[in-house]
From Swiss-Prot:
<keyword id="KW-0150">Chloroplast</keyword>
<keyword id="KW-0249">Electron transport</keyword>
<dbReference type="GO" id="GO:0009535">
    <property type="term" value="C:chloroplast thylakoid membrane"/>
</dbReference>
<comment type="similarity">
    <text>Belongs to the phycobiliprotein family.</text>
</comment>
<protein>
    <recommendedName>
        <fullName>Phycocyanin PC645 beta subunit</fullName>
    </recommendedName>
</protein>
<feature type="binding site">
    <location>
        <position position="85"/>
    </location>
    <ligand>
        <name>(2R,3E)-phycocyanobilin 2</name>
    </ligand>
</feature>
<keyword id="KW-0157">Chromophore</keyword>
<keyword id="KW-0793">Thylakoid</keyword>
<feature type="binding site">
    <location>
        <position position="148"/>
    </location>
    <ligand>
        <name>15,16-dihydrobiliverdin</name>
    </ligand>
</feature>
<feature type="binding site">
    <location>
        <position position="35"/>
    </location>
    <ligand>
        <name>(2R,3E)-phycocyanobilin 1</name>
    </ligand>
</feature>
<dbReference type="InterPro" id="IPR038719">
    <property type="entry name" value="Phycobilisome_asu/bsu_sf"/>
</dbReference>
<feature type="binding site">
    <location>
        <position position="84"/>
    </location>
    <ligand>
        <name>(2R,3E)-phycocyanobilin 2</name>
    </ligand>
</feature>
<dbReference type="GO" id="GO:0015979">
    <property type="term" value="P:photosynthesis"/>
</dbReference>
<comment type="subunit">
    <text>Heterotetramer of 2 different alpha chains and 2 identical beta chains which form 2 alpha-beta heterodimers within the heterotetramer.</text>
</comment>
<feature type="binding site" description="covalent">
    <location>
        <position position="158"/>
    </location>
    <ligand>
        <name>(2R,3E)-phycocyanobilin 1</name>
    </ligand>
</feature>
<feature type="binding site" description="covalent">
    <location>
        <position position="50"/>
    </location>
    <ligand>
        <name>15,16-dihydrobiliverdin</name>
    </ligand>
</feature>
<feature type="binding site">
    <location>
        <position position="39"/>
    </location>
    <ligand>
        <name>(2R,3E)-phycocyanobilin 1</name>
    </ligand>
</feature>
Length: 177
C-alpha cells in the first residue's frame, strides 16, 4: 500500500532525484486539504452500516429474485455474506480515500473479485448495482448533499474528494465487469 507520500518518494528514488517541484506542490496541497480528507472518511465510516444496508436493500428491491429460494441472498447466511462483502468493499474504498491512493483497494480487495463471485454463481450486475448505490451515497456525504447523516460532513468545496471517491468505486465496478 502506498500513500501519497510514499508514491512520490518511490518515484523520485527510481529516478535518483530529490523530491521537488510539482511533486512537492502536490504533497503540500495534499497536506493542506488533510482535514477535509479526514472529515470525508469520517463521514463515510460513521455511516458505514447505513450505506451498506441501503446498498444491499436497493439491489434487492430492484431484483427481488435475489431473496427467493433460489436467489443469492436467500437464507440469513447468504444475506450476511452479501452485507459482509459490501462492508469490505466500502472499508477498502475508505482506506484508499484516506491515503489518497488506490493500491490498497487494488491489492487487497479487487484482485480475483470477479472470479470469486463467478465461481460462487453471484451475478455481477447485482453487485455492480450495490457498489453504484454505495458510490452515490458516499459522494452525497462528501459533498454534503445527503440528509441522512449521523455526523457533520466536510466543510468547503469537496468536489475533488468526491470525484476521487467515485473513482475508487468505479475501479470496483470495473473489477466486477
Amino acid at each position: 500500500m502506498l500513500d501519497a507520500f510514499s508514491r512520490v518518494v518511490t518515484s523520485a528514488d527510481s529516478k535518483a532525484a530529490y523530491v521537488g517541484g510539482a511533486d512537492l506542490q502536490a504533497l503540500k496541497k495534499f497536506v493542506s486539504e488533510g482535514n477535509k480528507r479526514l472529515d470525508a472518511v469520517n463521514a463515510i465510516v460513521s455511516n458505514a452500516s447505513c450505506i451498506v444496508s441501503d446498498a444491499v436493500s436497493g439491489m434487492i428491491c430492484e431484483n427481488p429474485a435475489l431473496i427467493s429460494p433460489s436467489g443469492n441472498c436467500y437464507t440469513n447466511r447468504r444475506m450476511a455474506a452479501c452485507l459482509r462483502d459490501a462492508e469490505i468493499i466500502l472499508r477498502y474504498v475508505s482506506y484508499s480515500l484516506l491515503s489518497g491512493d488506490s493500491s490498497v483497494l487494488e491489492d487487497r480487495c479487487l484482485g480475483g473479485l470477479k472470479e470469486t463471485y463467478a465461481s460462487l454463481g453471484v451475478p455481477a450486475a447485482g453487485n455492480a448495482r450495490a457498489v453504484g448505490i454505495m458510490k452515490a451515497t458516499c459522494v452525497g456525504f462528501i459533498n454534503n448533499t445527503s440528509n441522512q447523516k449521523k455526523l457533520s460532513t466536510p466543510a468547503g468545496d469537496c468536489s475533488a474528494l468526491a470525484s476521487e471517491c467515485a473513482g475508487y468505486f468505479d475501479k470496483v465496478t470495473s473489477a466486477l465487469a
